[in-house]
A protein has these predicted regions:
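One-carbon transfer enzymes
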Residues: 1-204
Length: 204
């Protein structure tokens, strides 16, 4: 039986512990799955955009700081923010870059060709980027993505925050296959779990 070739899309070398666990799981199932490369989306920072958002970023960093202190009392979740070098599991990195045309971000043709040469069966999105159609077309079966939140109510980041803010009883999640509408796709699985008092606990 032919092995499924899987790639993970990230932002840089260091990833959260959940992406690292996923990479290790793929490696451990080497009779059915194979992952020889990961894709890192990297782009130049827009300084004007950063300056416009600086107050929001400072405020959110404070929330993260205090919630992270609270997480240290939860043995299971205390490493929620820990970053791990993905290259320890998957050695080869493919760097691709985005460029902007109007309100759209696309990838350079040479980068798309690099991804095509890998002949991935499936890509898994584990980054903060909206995936454009040119990257979707590089795989045999498409790109899978996990989302926190009930998509009928909340579509924006940060994950797990808005349900706490609006005091929702439950928090949704879904796994979807991304399509050309970019921010939506075909839902493969979805469900709900109880909303916790702090969004870091809920997103961990």
């Amino acid at each position: 039986m032919k092995k499924l070739k899987i790639g993970i899309i990230v932002n840089g070398n260091f990833v959260d512990k959940y992406t690292h666990q996923l990479a290790r799981w793929i490696k451990s199932n080497n009779k059915k799955l194979v992952s020889t490369s990961f894709i890192s989306i990297e782009k130049k920072k827009d300084l004007n955009f950063i300056n416009k958002k600086i107050l929001k970023k400072i405020f959110f960093k404070l929330i993260i700081f205090f919630e992270n202190l609270l997480l240290q009392f939860h043995q299971i979740h205390k490493s929620h923010l820990k970053k791990i070098d993905l290259r320890k599991v998957i050695k080869n990195k493919i760097i691709i870059q985005k460029y902007k045309i109007g309100n759209k971000y696309l990838f350079k043709n040479k980068d798309i060709e690099k991804v095509k040469k890998e002949k991935f069966d499936i890509l898994i999105r584990s980054c903060g980027e909206i995936i454009s159609e040119d990257l979707i077309k590089t795989t045999k079966y498409g790109i899978l993505s996990f989302h926190h939140g009930d998509y009928r109510k909340f579509r924006g980041s940060p994950a797990g925050f808005w349900e706490v803010f609006y005091r929702e009883i439950k928090t949704g999640f879904m796994i979807q296959k991304i399509d050309k509408t970019l921010d939506f796709g075909n839902i493969i699985s979805n469900g709900f779990f109880q909303t916790k008092s702090f969004f870091f606990i809920k997103s961990s």
